[in-house]
């Protein structure tokens, strides 16, 4: 995922000049992990790395015991309360009728949950559906926090590959983990340009400003004639980074 975000060689990442910290929160296979490791990684990004954005290309299926008092949920909420943007994969469970919401922690209100589209801009069949109801509060989700919020390319994305594990230098992968990184890259570039304006006179981004950035995201999405109606699998539409930046300029009254 780091190559999709920050590669600056033959393949250029979404934000090649980004200052990147990488936290290992999954096991050796990269496919499973423990909640304690995930929550510690999130807190490390917040406390030790002073992160502006925490990008989570991971998730657990809803109903796996993570409630509003779980360590992962608390760690994410601490980050949001501290003015850190959290972007998380919606999940790859679109073909599983038994799973009715995006992954944890993408299902947390302030998090930007990301779905995946294919090269034609159509929603990837495996991209998770979001529920109309917040699983923590039992209340109906409302704009701009309906799940998922946004979709981005996530099918067969080529990136750098660890030469330590294989002779290949590049490989491709598919999933909402990939699309999450593209949204992270877009936001990183936006914060580089408008971060001080978003933070305001106190120089500190707060939860209300995170929410307004999400309003701008929803209003900027390429919604293919959806007229900004939320779709349970596609979100408010497909990422348009340039339009998002322009909408942020409008929402925050930036000259």
Model-identified regions with their sequence ranges:
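Extracellular S/T/G-rich loop segment that most often corresponds to the catalytic His/Ser-adjacent loop
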Residues: 103-192, 243
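Subtilisin-like serine protease catalytic core
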Residues: 1-35, 49-53, 81, 107-111, ...
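Secretory-pathway/membrane protein signature
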Residues: 130-133, 145, 227-230, 241, ...
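Secreted peptidase-domain scaffold signal
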Residues: 91, 238-255
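Substrate-binding/access-modulating region of protease and related hydrolase catalytic domains
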Residues: 8, 25-110, 120, 145, ...
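Glycine-rich, acidic and aromatic/proline-enriched surface loops and short helix-turn segments
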Residues: 7, 44-50, 152-156, 219-222
């Amino acid at each position: 995922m780091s190559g999709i975000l920050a590669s600056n060689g033959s393949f250029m990442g979404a934000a090649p000049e980004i200052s990147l910290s990488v936290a290992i929160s999954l096991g050796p296979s990269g496919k499973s992990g423990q909640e304690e490791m995930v929550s510690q990684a999130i807190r490390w990004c917040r406390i030790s790395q002073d992160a502006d954005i925490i990008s989570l290309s991971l998730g657990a299926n809803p109903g796996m015991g993570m409630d509003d008092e779980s360590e992962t949920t608390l760690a994410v909420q601490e980050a949001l309360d501290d003015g850190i943007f959290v972007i998380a994969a919606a999940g790859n469970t679109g073909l599983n009728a038994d799973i009715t919401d995006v992954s944890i922690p993408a299902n947390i209100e302030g998090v930007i949950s990301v779905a995946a589209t294919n090269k034609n801009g159509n929603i990837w069949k495996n991209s998770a559906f979001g529920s109309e109801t917040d699983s923590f509060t039992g209340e109906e989700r409302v704009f701009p926090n309906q799940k998922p919020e946004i979709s981005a390319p996530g099918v067969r994305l080529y990136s750098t590959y660890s030469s330590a594990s294989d002779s290949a230098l590049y490989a491709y992968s598919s999933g909402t983990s990939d699309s999450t990184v593209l949204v992270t890259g877009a936001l990183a570039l936006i914060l580089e340009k408008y971060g001080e304006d978003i933070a305001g006179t106190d120089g500190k981004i707060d939860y209300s400003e995170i929410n307004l950035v999400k309003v701008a995201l929803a209003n900027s999405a390429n919604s293919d004639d959806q007229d900004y109606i939320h779709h349970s699998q596609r979100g408010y539409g497909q990422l348009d980074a340039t339009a998002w930046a322009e909408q942020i300029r409008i929402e925050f009254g930036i000259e």
